[in-house]
Amino acid sequence: MSEGPVYAQPSPGEATQRALVTVVFLRMLARPNRPATILPPGVSVTPERLDVAAYRALYNGVGGPWLWWLRRLMPDAQLEKHLANATTSISLLRVDGEVAGFFELDAAYWPFVNLNYFGLLPKFVGRGLGRLFLDYAVDEVFKGASSLRGMSVNTCNADHPRALPNYLAAGFEEYRRGRETWDIPTRLGFVIPEKVRG
C-alpha cells in the first residue's frame, strides 16, 4: 500500500505503478554564516497567493519530471484551504518577468518551518539558478522571528540528482533516511524511473 495521506490511497481496483524510494530528511538549525543572497539583474522572487489552478499548473510543471504526485491527488477544496492557510507561503522566482520556479514554506509546526516544495521549471534547470534560489529561501526563513528553531526539508532518489547535494551545500544536514513505497495511479501518466521502479 502507498504511504501518505488518505487522499493518496488508490481506489479499489485502480491501476497503479509502484515506486520504491529512499527519502532523506534534512534540517538546518541556524542560518548559515554567509552574506545575504543578492539576486542578479532580471531575477526576482516575490511572495504570492495562488489559486488552485495556478498552483496546480506550477506544481505539475516543476515536479512532473521528478514524480511529484501527492498534490495532484489532493481534492481541490482541500488544496484551496491549504493555500489560504496563514501558515502556508509560496514565493515565485521570475527571470526577466517569466515564472521560473517556486518554493512553498509551511510554518504549521512552528518554531520549525518546512520547505514543502522547491524547484525550477525544466527550461530554467542548469542555468545556475537553483542554488541561488535555495539560498534566498533559507534567508527568507531565518530573517524572521527570533523564536524560530530551524528549517527542514526532505528529498528522495526520484528527485533531480542535484537536489540532495544542493541542500547539503546550502547548509542542511541529514538526520534521517528511510524507504517508502509509492503506489502511483497510472492515470497520472508518470513514467517511473528504472532506479525506483518497484
Predicted regions and their residues:
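Conserved catalytic-core motifs of GNAT/GCN5-like acyltransferases
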Residues: 21-26, 173-189
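Conserved beta-strand-loop-alpha-helix junction that forms the acyl-donor binding cleft
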Residues: 125, 152-163, 180-189
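A conserved beta-strand-loop-helix scaffold within acyl/acetyltransferase catalytic domains
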Residues: 70-77, 83-122
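Acyl-donor-binding surface of acyltransferase catalytic domains
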Residues: 1-43
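Conserved acetyl-CoA-binding loop-helix of GNAT-fold acetyltransferases
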Residues: 120, 126-143, 165-169
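Short amphipathic alpha-helix that is part of the acyltransferase structural core
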Residues: 39-70, 193, 198
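Short acidic/polar active-site loop segments enriched in Thr and Asp
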Residues: 89, 149, 173
